[in-house]
Amino acid sequence: MNSLPVPSTIARIAPDGNLTPRQKRRVMIDMLKRRVRPGTGSSAEFMRRRTATNPWPDLRPILRGIDWVIVGGVATRAYMPERMTKDMDILVNENDGQAVVAKLEGAGYQIISRLAISGYAMRSPEGIEIDVIFGSHPWLKDMLVHLKSDPAGYPVIGLPYLILLKMAAQRAQDWADVSRMLGLASDIELDEVRAVVARYTPEDIEDLESLIFIGKKEQEVPPTTE
């Protein structure tokens, strides 16, 4: 199969088309900023909903005594309308990783495979996939003392740290989640996000402000037409 031609917009950044994750994110942000319009998102009532409709396993009894937190797509339901995702991701300190796996195995969970990053994909007795991520992030200790709860009462990563993770990801879905969550965040929450990003990834501040702009623009009420 012939390779796709590299579009001129991308070729100006990476002639061979091999964008870094940060370059890829910048291209997406630039396109969105050119196209975003007030009120292009869902209704305000829908956007305010926080639900826990999807029945993810409750790991609290199994992992009692160990610090853990939900990350990934399931975590976003604490900050925006719930969306479908194929599995539940949890983040634990790498020093607790083997203990977490052992506790889950004792509860009937099975290891499917190793993850591309440090950790394991596991399957619950009901067939639900759980990705157990062993974390060594410089912000991990701070994050674990600033936990939030989702509508089901499960421990969820705080918004600033979820933004850090999703901004470092390579999927457009992650960046869409970021702009939506930021668009729905309060001024106080945005200042908390800015402070954490400035501390841990200051090189991402410009992109963060762009994603805030896009998210807030989508939440604006469109102008009425006579």
Model-derived regions: residue spans:
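Compositionally biased terminal segments of proteins
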Residues: N2-E226
